[in-house]
């Protein structure tokens, strides 16, 4: 049951009866509203308590997930229509979206976590609980292999090649690639597979999947997002956190450590090197140090 079930039902009836929208458009509107509601469900917010800051924070999280600005704008449009309807029918006195601007086109880089912040988040997973073991294993692969959230939730048991130190993932366009994963990732994966997963009542359509929820079904992207957000909050991290943040941090730390850009491109599954260059944010201090260490003029200055 949704927190805003009554209001969503009324809006749905309005879309079908008053506006005569197609089933596809009707469902798209409701999905947009339910995304916002799911986001706010971490700390439940009543419909009449939603304000502009909630909407802005939600849009920022969509951005951190790598959602394109055009898709963010469409989602905001659905949410805006919902609140306008609630004002019109007297449920609300004001519309929290009235001053919210549509997301600007263009691509901004998501927040990057430091290694210490990554470690602090990983340590919040409670290894005394089944979900904690699973969550630790998932985050180890998000950061240790730079997986997209869809690649993590779609990871199959047959995709694990521990002896070779690789996993097989299916990226965009269902393209397969082999990605190296570290010892800690396999360590916590084995702990999950040996001590947790055997006790889960696995659904028939999920037997091939690695990571499951407590009911034995595959995990949703939203669930992984909420897990990341919850553990980051427990670690005292105030940045906008999502599964995408771990992937971005994976790439950033590799480049800062001296990894070849082409190798990072292959691990991330980017078709174009330009995507990797945009995706990989190098801080100014690192770039300055690179110039000081390797530029001929800098070396000349040291000899004078």
Regions flagged by a language model, labelled:
Residues 1-304:
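Conserved catalytic core of the tyrosine transesterase superfamily
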């Amino acid at each position: 049951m949704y927190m805003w079930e009554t209001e969503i039902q009324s809006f749905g009836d309005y879309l079908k009866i008053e506006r005569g929208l197609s089933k596809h458009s009707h469902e798209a509107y409701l999905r947009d509203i339910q995304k916002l509601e799911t986001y706010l469900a971490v700390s439940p917010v009543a419909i009449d308590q939603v304000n502009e800051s909630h909407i802005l924070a939600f849009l920022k999280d969509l951005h951190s997930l790598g959602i394109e600005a055009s898709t963010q704008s469409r989602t905001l449009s659905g949410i805006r229509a919902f609140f306008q309807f609630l004002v019109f029918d007297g449920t609300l006195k004001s519309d929290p979206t009235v001053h919210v601007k549509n997301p600007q086109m263009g691509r901004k880089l998501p927040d990057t976590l430091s290694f210490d912040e990554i470690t602090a988040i990983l340590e919040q997973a409670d290894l005394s609980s089944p979900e904690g073991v699973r969550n630790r294993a998932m985050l180890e692969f998000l950061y240790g292999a730079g997986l997209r959230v869809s690649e993590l939730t779609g990871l199959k048991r047959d995709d694990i090649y521990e002896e070779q130190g690789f996993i097989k993932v299916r990226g965009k366009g269902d393209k397969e690639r082999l990605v190296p994963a570290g010892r800690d990732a396999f360590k916590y994966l084995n702990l999950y597979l040996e001590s947790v997963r055997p006790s889960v009542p696995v659904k028939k359509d999920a037997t091939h999947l690695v990571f499951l929820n407590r009911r034995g079904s595959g995990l949703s992207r939203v669930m992984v997002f909420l897990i990341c957000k919850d553990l980051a909050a427990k670690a005292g991290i105030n940045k906008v956190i999502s599964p995408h943040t771990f992937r971005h941090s994976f790439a950033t730390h590799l480049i800062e450590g001296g990894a070849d850009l082409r190798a990072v491109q292959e691990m991330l599954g980017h078709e174009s090197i330009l995507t990797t260059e945009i995706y990989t944010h190098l801080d100014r201090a690192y770039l300055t140090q690179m110039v000081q260490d390797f530029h001929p003029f800098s070396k000349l200055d040291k000899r004078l």
